[in-house]
């Protein structure tokens, strides 16, 4: 464990951020799986929105977000 006060704070912050990022990615995956189980316009919009949110927060690359959304759109159409 770190001895310097600022390093201790950063270590605690890293844990919190990791939990938050993991939850966000998990929610994205859940939305995608829900759409794939039952493709509908409403579930597509929810999945697309969650993908965009993850990309805007830097959890996934923007190109991956575009690729995932395109693949979902082909399943919808």
UniProtKB/Swiss-Prot annotation:
One of its GO terms (molecular function) is small ribosomal subunit rRNA binding. Keywords: Ribonucleoprotein, Ribosomal protein, RNA-binding, rRNA-binding. Gene3D superfamilies: Ribosomal protein S20. One of its GO terms (biological process) is translation. Pfam families: Ribosomal_S20p. The keyword S-adenosyl-L-methionine does not apply. The keyword Hydrolase does not apply. InterPro entries: Ribosomal_bS20 (IPR002583), Ribosomal_bS20_sf (IPR036510). GO terms for cellular component: cytosol; small ribosomal subunit. It comes from the Bacteria. HAMAP family: Ribosomal_bS20. Binds directly to 16S ribosomal RNA. Belongs to the bacterial ribosomal protein bS20 family. This is Small ribosomal subunit protein bS20. It comes from Streptococcus agalactiae serotype Ia (strain ATCC 27591 / A909 / CDC SS700).
């Amino acid at each position: 464990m770190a001895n310097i006060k600022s390093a201790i704070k950063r270590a605690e912050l890293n844990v919190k951020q990791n939990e938050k990022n993991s939850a966000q990615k998990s929610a994205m995956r859940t939305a995608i799986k829900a759409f794939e189980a039952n493709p509908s316009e409403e579930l597509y919009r929810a999945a697309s929105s969650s993908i965009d949110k993850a990309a805007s927060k830097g959890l996934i690359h923007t190109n991956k977000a575009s690729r995932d959304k395109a693949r979902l759109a082909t399943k919808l159409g």
